[in-house]
C-alpha cells in the first residue's frame, strides 16, 4: 500500500507511475473523497473547539449559581452534529483505505519502460541448451512413459491441472525440495520456516493478494480463510504488526510449502504438464531489510535463486520485468526463465521482487532505527524455486534417447545414489 500522504501530496508522480504501468485507477475519485474528508475534519474540529468553549462557560456559570439552558442546548446540538460528521469521516476513511488497497506499487526508477512481457529486457543468460541428436519429448510424456507422474488419475481424483507423483517421481520431487532447502540454509544463510498452508484474510491483504486478486485464490467456504498461493503470504505475515530490532536486519527466511492457485486468468495456457497446476510445491525466499539496503538485497536474492539452476546444470536466463509486466505489489522484479527443450523457449521458474515498503505498510511491519524511531522495513521475496517446474526442466533437459532420464549429480545424494530413472 502506498503512503496516504505521498498519494495526497504527489498526484503528478502517482499518475505518472500508473501511466508507466499502463493501469487505470480512479484517482480523481480518490482526490475528491480526500478533499471532502479534509473539509469535514476542519468543520468538526471547529465544532469541537466551540463545544469546549461552551462547556467551560456552562461550568463557570454553574459555579456562580446561574443556569445556562441555551448553552446546554447548543452543546447538545454540537455533540449530535459532531457525532454525525465523525461517522461520515469514518465512512470516508474506509472508502479511501479500500481505494488505496487497489492502487499498485510505484515502479523503481531503474525499471525499464514497456507494455508487456514481450518487452522485458534479458539481463543475462547461463548455460547452453543441449543438442540432443533426437527430438526431445515434453516432460508430461516422459513422466507418463516412466510411470512417475500420473496426470490422468490426478484429473479423475481432483480435476484438471492436478497430478500424482509416484515412485521415483515422488522421490525426485522430494529430493528437489530438500536440495533447495539445504542450499539456501547452509550456503545462503536463510533460516527455514515451515508455515501454515491456510491463512486469514488479513494475511492475504498484507502481502497484496487481496482484495484485487480474490478470483485467483481458493477460499474456504463459510470462513475468512484461504489456501496459500505461495509461502510468501504466511512468512511475510510472520511479523505483521510487529516492530523488529533494526540491528538484526536483514532477516532471511526460506520455506517449503504447497501452493494453491485458481489460475482464473490462465484458461488455455499450458494446459498440459506441470507448468501451470492448481496445486504445486515451491521453496520461497523472503527477506526483511532496511530501506537503503533493499536493492542490493534484491540482487543477492536473485543470485541465490540462480544458484539452484546452476547447481542443477539447467540453462536459464534472467529478465527484468518492464513497467507493463510488473506485478501489483512489486517495485522491481527479475524473472528467472529455464530452458524447456519441448517448447524450444524459456519458461518462468522464479520471480524475485523488491516490494519496498508496499507490503510492510499494509502489514504494519516496522523496525526501530539507530535513532530509536520506527520506520517500515522493505520486504523482498522470490521463488527458490518452483519445484514442479524444476522437475519438468530436469525431465526435459536430462532425457536420453532410450527414454530414460539422467539424475543431476547435485540430486543423487537425495535419491539414494540413483543416477538414472528408467
Curated annotation (Swiss-Prot):
Belongs to the class-II aminoacyl-tRNA synthetase family. Type-1 seryl-tRNA synthetase subfamily. It catalyses: tRNA(Ser) + L-serine + ATP = L-seryl-tRNA(Ser) + AMP + diphosphate + H(+); tRNA(Sec) + L-serine + ATP = L-seryl-tRNA(Sec) + AMP + diphosphate + H(+). Homodimer. The tRNA molecule binds across the dimer. GO terms for cellular component: cytoplasm. The gene is serS. GO terms for molecular function: ATP binding; catalytic activity, acting on a protein; serine-tRNA ligase activity; transferase activity. L-serine binds at residues 230-232, 284, 383. It comes from Pelotomaculum thermopropionicum (strain DSM 13744 / JCM 10971 / SI). Pathway: Aminoacyl-tRNA biosynthesis; selenocysteinyl-tRNA(Sec) biosynthesis; L-seryl-tRNA(Sec) from L-serine and tRNA(Sec): step 1/1. ATP binds at residues 261-263, 348-351. It is an enzyme of class 6 (ligase). HAMAP family: Ser_tRNA_synth_type1 (MF_00176). InterPro entries: aa-tRNA-synt_IIb, aa-tRNA-synth_II, aa-tRNA-synth_II/BPL/LPL, Ser-tRNA-ligase_type_1, Ser-tRNA-synth_1_N, SerRS_1_N_sf, SerRS_core, tRNA-bd_arm. This is Serine--tRNA ligase.
Amino acid at each position: 500500500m502506498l503512503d496516504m500522504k505521498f498519494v495526497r501530496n504527489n498526484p503528478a508522480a502517482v499518475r505518472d507511475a500508473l501511466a508507466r504501468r499502463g493501469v487505470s485507477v480512479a484517482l480523481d475519485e480518490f482526490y475528491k473523497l480526500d478533499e471532502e474528508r479534509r473539509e469535514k475534519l476542519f468543520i468538526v474540529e471547529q465544532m469541537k473547539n466551540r463545544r469546549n468553549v461552551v462547556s467551560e462557560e456552562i461550568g463557570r456559570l454553574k459555579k456562580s449559581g446561574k443556569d445556562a439552558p441555551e448553552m446546554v442546548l447548543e452543546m447538545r446540538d454540537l455533540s449530535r452534529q459532531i457525532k454525525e460528521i465523525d461517522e461520515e469521516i469514518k465512512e470516508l476513511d474506509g472508502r479511501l483505505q479500500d481505494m488505496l488497497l487497489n492502487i499498485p506499487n510505484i515502479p523503481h526508477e531503474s525499471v525499464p519502460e514497456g507494455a508487456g512481457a514481450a518487452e522485458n529486457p534479458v539481463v543475462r543468460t547461463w548455460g547452453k541448451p543441449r543438442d540432443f541428436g533426437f527430438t526431445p519429448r515434453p516432460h508430461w510424456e516422459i513422466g507418463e512413459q516412466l510411470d512417475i507422474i500420473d496426470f490422468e488419475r490426478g484429473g479423475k481424483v481432483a480435476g484438471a491441472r492436478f497430478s500424482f507423483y509416484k515412485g521415483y517421481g515422488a522421490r525426485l520431487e522430494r529430493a528437489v525440495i530438500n536440495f533447495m532447502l539445504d542450499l539456501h540454509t547452509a550456503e545462503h544463510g536463510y533460516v527455514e520456516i515451515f508455515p501454515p498452508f491456510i491463512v486469514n484474510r488479513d494475511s492475504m491483504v498484507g502481502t497484496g493478494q487481496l482484495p484485487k486478486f480474490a478470483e485467483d485464490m481458493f477460499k474456504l467456504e463459510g470462513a475468512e480463510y484461504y489456501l496459500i498461493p505461495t509461502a510468501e503470504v504466511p512468512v511475510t505475515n510472520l511479523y505483521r504488526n510487529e516492530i523488529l530490532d533494526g540491528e538484526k536486519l536483514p532477516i532471511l527466511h526460506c520455506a517449503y510449502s504447497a501452493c494453491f492457485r485458481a489460475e482464473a486468468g490462465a484458461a488455455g495456457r499450458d494446459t498440459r504438464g506441470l507448468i501451470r497446476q492448481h496445486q504445486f510445491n515451491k521453496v520461497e525466499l523472503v527477506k526483511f531489510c532496511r530501506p537503503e539496503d533493499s536493492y542490493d538485497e534484491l540482487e543477492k536474492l536473485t543470485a541465490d535463486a540462480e544458484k539452484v539452476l546452476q547447481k542443477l546444470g539447467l540453462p536459464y536466463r534472467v529478465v527484468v520485468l518492464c513497467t507493463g509486466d510488473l506485478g501489483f505489489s512489486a517495485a522491481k522484479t527479475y524473472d528467472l526463465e529455464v530452458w524447456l527443450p519441448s517448447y524450444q523457449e524459456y519458461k518462468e521458474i522464479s520471480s524475485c521482487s523488491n516490494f519496498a515498503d508496499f507490503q510492510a505498510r499494509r502489514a504494519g511491519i516496522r523496525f526501530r532505527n539507530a535513532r530509536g524511531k520506527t520506520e517500515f522495513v522493505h520486504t523482498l521475496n522470490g521463488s527458490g524455486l518452483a519445484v514442479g517446474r524444476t522437475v519438468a526442466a530436469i525431465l526435459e533437459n536430462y532425457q536420453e534417447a532410450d527414454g530414460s532420464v539422467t539424475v543431476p549429480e547435485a540430486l543423487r545424494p537425495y535419491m539414494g545414489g540413483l543416477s538414472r530413472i528408467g
